[in-house]
Swiss-Prot record:
Catalyzes the reversible conversion of alpha-D-glucosamine 6-phosphate (GlcN-6P) into beta-D-fructose 6-phosphate (Fru-6P) and ammonium ion, a regulatory reaction step in de novo uridine diphosphate-N-acetyl-alpha-D-glucosamine (UDP-GlcNAc) biosynthesis via hexosamine pathway. Deamination is coupled to aldo-keto isomerization mediating the metabolic flux from UDP-GlcNAc toward Fru-6P. At high ammonium level can drive amination and isomerization of Fru-6P toward hexosamines and UDP-GlcNAc synthesis. It comes from Bos taurus. Homohexamer. It is found in: Cytoplasm. Its main location: cytoplasm. The keyword Ribosomal protein does not apply. Allosterically activated by N-acetylglucosamine-6-phosphate (GlcNAc6P). The lineage of its organism: Eukaryota, Metazoa, Chordata, Craniata, Vertebrata. Keywords: Carbohydrate metabolism, Coiled coil, Cytoplasm, Hydrolase, Isomerase, Phosphoprotein. PROSITE patterns: GLC_GALNAC_ISOMERASE. The gene is GNPDA2. CDD domains: GlcN6P_deaminase (cd01399). This is Glucosamine-6-phosphate deaminase 2.
């Protein structure tokens, strides 16, 4: 497990974007060899997406041979609703890059048979060869995707009832009106994300500091689903200084002492431009 600590949100976002960029380019994707990327929504990854868009517009990165699988989607919210994750991904990322829309997979929260939709999503991931890099974020209660506290740590893509903490947190996106906030969602399982060859989890802000503490300094616990990734062979937690406030001083000191190693993963930043 790696813990990468940057001074602030912008630097953490940039480090994460550089890492994704380098992993895609090192993979050398092509017509018969797609890089498969798992993606989150929410406020945390926005800075990372902006940097990836910048790399694309500069000609350094192409998503032509990338397939994406999103973590989750609300149930019952129209696809074109401004707060649907289809809208989020299109407006904040997909419409700014060269990905084929057929290669951008998002769960359909309006499917007639929701369980069949979940099963089909798992099948699509398998047919794509599995996820090369799954990027995630967490909530203050340590949930990843919509795997709320108490979720099975071997769970697969399924229908979930949202915890009240999550509904309250999401109310800001629905004019503060709890009655408008979806109470159910389709989500990949903890096991689905654990199956990825590599996982990178973005954690920023003091309000997520206790969750980061639970994620890496205490044992694996289904009440803090993000803690499951202690047992993944290739997990990177990328955080800002504020998110480390609940960690032991020696933990922070240890991982900061490794930053010269971690920075070699993103420096130099590779490019798809000819000659780079």
């Amino acid at each position: 497990m790696r813990l990468v600590i940057l001074d602030n949100y912008d630097l953490a976002s940039e480090w994460a974007a550089k890492y994704i960029c380098n992993r895609i380019i090192q993979f050398r994707p092509g017509q018969d060899r797609y890089f498969t990327l798992g993606l989150p929504t929410g406020s945390t990854p926005l800075g990372c997406y902006k940097k990836l868009i910048e790399y694309h517009k500069n000609g350094d990165l192409s998503f032509k041979y990338v397939k994406t699988f999103n973590m989750d989607e609300y149930v019952g919210l129209p696809r074109n609703h401004p707060e649907s994750y289809h809208s989020y991904m299109w407006n904040n990322f997909f419409k700014h890059i060269d990905i084929d829309p057929n290669n951008a997979h998002i769960l359909d929260g309006n499917a007639t048979d929701l369980q069949a939709e979940c099963d089909a999503f798992e099948k699509k991931i398998k047919e794509a060869g599995g996820i090369d890099l799954f990027v995630g974020g967490i909530g203050p209660d340590g949930h990843i995707a919509f795997n709320e506290p108490g979720s099975s740590l071997v769970s697969r893509t399924r229908l979930k009832t949202l915890a009240m903490d999550t509904i309250l947190a999401n109310a800001k996106y629905f004019d503060g009106d709890l009655s408008k906030v979806p109470t159910m969602a389709l989500t990949v399982g903890v096991g689905t994300v654990m199956d990825a060859r590599e996982v990178m989890i973005l954690i920023t802000g003091a309000h997520k500091a206790f969750a980061l503490y639970k994620a890496i300094e205490e044992g694996v616990n289904h009440m803090w689903t993000v803690s499951a990734f202690q047992q993944h062979p290739r997990t990177i937690f990328v955080c800002d200084e504020d998110a480390t406030l609940e960690l032991r001083v020696k933990t922070v000191k240890y991982f900061k002492g490794l930053m010269h190693v971690h920075n070699k993963l993103v420096d130099p930043l590779y490019s798809m431009k000819e000659g780079n």
